[in-house]
Amino acid sequence: KPREYISFRLGAGTSTFADGKILRNGKPIAIKSARYNARTTYDEALAEIKALKAQGINTLLPDNPQPEWFYDICDGLGVYVIERANINPNEQSQNRKIGGTPSNNPDLVGEYLARVKAMYYRTRNHSCIIAYALGGDAAGNGYNMYKAYQWLKGVEKNRAIICTSAEGEWNTDL
């Protein structure tokens, strides 16, 4: 006998990745993106996102986790989101020695995986999510990003996974 009901809007649509392209319902999408972080109320964010959509923006790139209602707004308006894990180390280094950068420090792998898992489980049921990003633009690459990519590929079979710091390495789909 159910003890609790939680309402959740469902969106229809599939996001997949093939031949270097993000597909929505099997068709390639032309992404016109903008960085956006909901630092406002629901009503203000709704108005801002509607205005961005009116300008032709169809994809939002938040820098960090957003309030749950942000994803609900995007689901409702048909705006796509490339969700980013909250991995933004202050140390920016291209030092590829073990420990030379936080992303290549095996002591931090648990923290990296926890953030990627939180991102995935928080947003996996939102139809607006078309791809996942493994951290900020300056997150660097290395052991922790490899492990994060492998874990995410193990649970997410359809959406693209992006590591902007991969620079030609294997741990990114785009």
Give the ranges of each region predicted by the language model.
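Substrate-binding/catalytic cleft of secreted carbohydrate-active enzymes
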Residues: 46, 59-174
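N-terminal carbohydrate-binding accessory modules
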Residues: 1-54, 72
